[in-house]
Structure formats: structure tokens, C-alpha cells
Amino acid sequence: MNIVGVLSGKRKCLLAIAIAFSTFGNAQLVTYPEGLNTGMPHNDDYTVKVREAGGEWKDVFEYEVQVDMDRVQSASMVQFDIGSPVEVMVKKNNGTIQDVKIRPLAIGIQHTVNHNAIFFTLTRPQCLSIEFNGDRLHNLHLFANPLETETYTESSDKVMYFGPGVHRPKDLPNRSE
């Protein structure tokens, strides 16, 4: 018997809402693929994807960042939020992989190499530097942040609220409190 076919229109809608909330309400991985929409520069040295164990791969936006302020160089940065172990795939888009270091080395993250990509698992939030072929300046800065537990709105008391997007110092409100 097809239970969905038996349900009335209103009940079908309620069932769909319940399924959606049960699926997204327990999300343990939050990605931010919308980087291109913010006007931030993209760095295509690497392609990064993450997934909950055995789940579907999700794209992560690779930001172009500046490092070494004495001799400015471009590097890559990605960020996502995790609340449970995740699998990470980092594909090197230019050249071959001879050597990989995932810093801090003391953490001892083990990785596997498959052609021009590495795979590893993160069991908790961490900030890492992934270096290919001894290149410390054109590395990938990976920020696996903890899931957000606090939420704020524009009307929250004693909070200077900045909504989603890119903000610069000129965006600060001029308050004389």
C-alpha cells in the first residue's frame, strides 16, 4: 500500500515538513559554497569537498587570501562547520602530488593520496594548514569550525548585528554610546 497516496493534501504537506525538519534539524555539517556571490576572490589552486561519513560530497568555496606580508603571496582558505566526524577531499588542480604535510604535525592526521587528491577524516573542529610538495606559502588554510550554537537577530539586545555577506570597516554603524 502506498501510504503517501492515501494521505490527504494537508497531511502530505505536514509529512513533507516533518521530514524536512528531521533531515536538516540534525545537520552536523554546514558548508558555505556561496563565496562567488559575495564578490570575494576565488582561488582555483585546490578543489575542496566535505561530507558526513558515507554521505554526499558538498562543495566548499576556496577563497584567495594573502599571506607573508613581507613578500605578499596568494594562498587558499576554506571554512565549514562540523558537529560530527567528516571526510575531506582536497584536489590539487595544478601539478602532481609528491609530498603532503597536514599541520600541525603533532595532531597526526593520516591521509591517503589518489591521483591528484588527498582524503582524510576530521573527528572534531580544527584549523589546519595543508602543504603540497613543500610549498608553505601557497598552502590551503582549512578552518573546520564548531557548529554555531547561538543565534542573533537585528533586534538582539546589546548586539551589533551583521547579517550574511562581506562587511568592511565602512559598514560599521556610527554609534555614540
Placement of each model-derived feature along the sequence:
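Alpha-helical protein-protein interaction elements
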Residues: 13-16, 154
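Bacterial N-terminal signal peptides that target proteins for export
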Residues: 1-14
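Hydrophobic h-region of N-terminal signal peptides that target proteins for export
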Residues: 17-26
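Generic detector of low-complexity/intrinsically disordered segments
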Residues: 9, 16-17, 142-144
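Extracellular/periplasmic carbohydrate-active domains that bind, remodel
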Residues: 28-177
